[in-house]
Amino acid sequence: MKKIVIALLVTFGLTTIVSAEIGVKVGVSAQIGEMETSGKEVSSDGTTKTSNTEEALFATGGFFIEKDLAFLPGPFGRLSVGFDNIAHDLDLGSQSNYRERTLGAGGAVELKSKHTLEAEVTDFETLYATLNVTDWLYLKAGTVTVDVTTKFNGTSTSSYPTSHSLDGTVLGFGVEKSSDNGMFFRLEFNDYSIDGKSIVNAGTDSKFTATLNDVSGSTGRIAIGKAF
C-alpha cells in the first residue's frame, strides 16, 4: 500500500501543467502525541498478570493525499476524503515481566522466567473525511489501521504470533491557511481510540493468552502541502 500511495504522490507532484483545478491536495505532515494502554497475560487456571497503564510519547512523519467533493450539491460539497500514512517504521521499544513458577499445558513445572516483548509499528494508515466549517476551520473523522510487528523472548515453550493488525477511529479538528499559488499550511488536533487484541500462546505452553487492552491518546499535527 505504501508503494502505491507514494507513486500517486510522485505523479501528482510532478504535474506542472494543470488545465483546471482538479480538487486534489497532497502533502507531508509531522505529529507528536501521547498514547496509553495496559495489558495482561491470563492462564487457563485463572491466574492473571496485569500491567499498569503505560503512557508513552511518540512522534511520526507522514504523507497524505486528499480529494474534495465539491461536485456534490449543497453542504456535501464542503466534504473531502483522504488517505494518510506514516513514512517510516515506529519503534515502540520493549517491555519485560517475570512469570512465576507454573504448570505448563502438559503438566510440566515451568520455572520462574523473564519474558520480553519488542514491538514496532510498520503502518499507521488513516482513511478520513473532513468537513469545512468555514474557509479556515474543518472537522475530521476517520478509521485507523495499525500494523504492528512483535518479537517475543522468553521460555522455549512459549510462542506468540508476530504480526498484528489493530483497528480504531480518529476524531479531530484543524485550521488551514492557503495561498494563491495552491500551497497550504495546517494545524490539527486528533483524538485516537484503537481496539485492543488478544492472542493465544502458540507454543507447547498453550495455556496462556496475552491481551493488549484498548489504546487511546491524542496528537498535535502540522502539515504542509499543495492543492491542484
Residue ranges and their predicted role:
Residues 28-30, 61-67, 83, 127-133, ...:
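Residues on the lipid-exposed face of transmembrane beta-strands in outer-membrane beta-barrel proteins
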Residues 1-23, 228:
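Cleavable N-terminal export/targeting peptides
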Residues 36-49, 92-102, 144-165, 197-207:
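Outer-membrane beta-barrel translocator domains and adjoining extracellular loop/strand segments
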Residues 19-96, 101-107, 111, 219-223, ...:
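Short glycine/proline- and aromatic-enriched beta-strand/turn motifs that initiate or cap beta-hairpins
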Residues 16, 20-22, 71-77, 123, ...:
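Short coil turns and loop connectors of transmembrane beta-barrels in diderm outer membranes
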Residues 32-36, 57-61, 85-87, 123-125, ...:
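Transmembrane beta-barrel architecture of outer-membrane proteins
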Residues 39-41, 48-51, 169-171, 177-228:
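Predominantly the C-terminal beta-signal and adjacent terminal strand-loop region
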